[in-house]
Amino acid sequence: MHKDVRHRFNAAFTPEKYEAFLHTVNTAYGEPVTFRVCETPVFVPRDLKNKLLKGVEDICAVITRPDFRKKSAAAIPPHIQVPNEAEHTVFLQLDFGICRDAEGNLTPQLIEMQGFPSLYFFQHLLAEAYRKHFDIPADFHHLFGG
């Protein structure tokens, strides 16, 4: 996605670096990963990052409206509703797929919204391992807040 950084990353990639990276991920906390880990991080260009952030802001504006719970109550069948649910979730995860629009530009499309922190720790570990074993530019962050 970010062509210059992608080219530099690919040019410097070696199977040995990837194996060392996997070793870090699998041994850092005593529990090996049970799924395939991608050889490379995703390098998101600034314009796509801004589109992602705008999408998050738009979704949050809807789900934090005072009337949202009332309007969405029928979306969850009574037999799977959670008793004593908090007014707002502590965690919010928005998963986006990256597609091309009619003009060929990269654009995010919401895939899923979750209210639990299932992968936060692993994603931080993964980002740190990429930095340890590969030359990731210092101004690229895995957290949008920097």
Kindly give the residue locations of the regions a language model identified:
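Preference for protein termini
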Residues: M1-G146
